Design a protein with these regions (language model features):
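A short secondary-structure junction motif
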Residues: 34-38, 65, 87-95, 143
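Alpha-helical structural segments
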Residues: 5, 22-42, 53, 57
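Hydrophobic alpha-helical segments that form the core
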Residues: 100-123, 127-142
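Regular secondary-structure segments
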Residues: 32, 36, 40, 63, ...
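Amphipathic alpha-helical packing segments from all-alpha helical-bundle domains
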Residues: 53, 74-111, 130
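DNA-binding alpha-helical recognition surfaces that contact promoter or target DNA
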Residues: 15, 25-26, 134
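Helix-turn-helix
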Residues: 1-22
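Hydrophobic alpha-helical connector segments
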Residues: 40-68
């Protein structure tokens, strides 16, 4: 079921994956890499328009990949968002020589987005993307 829901062709599954776990890893890696590539340019920015554009793209990506995300959630895992947090640790430099703000602000913003969007997906995406963006921006603009 996860192979079908995640839109992976059966032939591709047998040719490229050894298990359902491999499919989940592939999907999470693909989505996490896309998130990282898009967030890095805005992470240290205070430009509200850039942040809104990023959030709009990220949330629309979540909507467009809903089948894949739901397939992962059907396996009762938070693999995607755990994977995103792990990848953030690789890219966001937490250097002890910096101020607390320098060390943690980028990571806090990324984790905020990950966890709010995860909750939104888990709750069935009831609110509009605009409502979620406005909610997230109310926090992002504080930093």
């Amino acid at each position: 079921d996860i192979v079908k829901t995640a839109q992976v062709a059966r032939v591709s599954f047998y040719r490229n994956f050894n298990s359902i776990s491999d499919v989940v890893d592939y999907i999470t890696d693909e989505l996490a890499n896309e998130f990282i590539d898009k967030i890095l340019p805005v992470l240290n920015s205070n430009d509200e328009n850039k942040w809104r554009e990023f959030l709009f793209d990220f949330i629309n990506n979540a909507l467009n990949n809903r089948g894949k995300i739901e397939a992962i959630n059907l396996q009762n895992t938070a693999v995607l968002f755990s994977h995103l947090n792990t990848k953030m640790q690789m890219y966001v430099n937490v250097n002890s020589n910096k101020t607390i703000s320098d060390k943690y602000t980028s990571y806090v913003k990324a984790c905020l987005i990950n966890n709010v969007v995860k909750k939104w997906i888990d709750d069935g995406m009831v609110e509009t993307p605009e409502e979620i963006i406005n909610y997230l921006m109310s926090f992002i603009t504080l930093f």
